[in-house]
Amino acid sequence: MKRLIFSMGAFILLSLQWGGWALAEDLGRLSANPYNPESTSNPYGVGSPYRADSINNPYGPYGSPYSPKSTTNPYATDAPKLYDSQGNYRGRLSRNPYDPDSISNPYGRYGSPYSPDSINNPYGGGSPYAADSPNNPYGRGWRIEGTD
């Protein structure tokens, strides 16, 4: 009986945890590589302006200048999150200069040109030579996750 209750409890906890992961929508990779089909720089792949969930679609939830989930809205409150190839959080893909996690905040951890975690630091996270850097034209880039 104890084993059954323990198994059911573990199952419920794991399903709740996996259910939280299912809420994140994969929006591709922030990358300068135009040949990678998952790159936002590929106009025929994830970066297509006609794709409903593309950050390059000005009428979609992630590309509209009016959506709170948008990368182009300077007042966005729920912009997509960035993760590198090791799963480390790299800030929010947002033009909001006031959001502390935004890559557009020049004084924040993820937007400062002096922070090692910033995409704007050419010697840190934004190095054009790192294989997973978004600024490497032949690299993989960082994963973009939106919320449903």
Give the predicted meaning of each segment.
Residues A22-D148:
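Repetitive, compositionally biased segments used for assembly/scaffolding
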Residues M1-M8:
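Bacterial N-terminal signal peptides that target proteins for export
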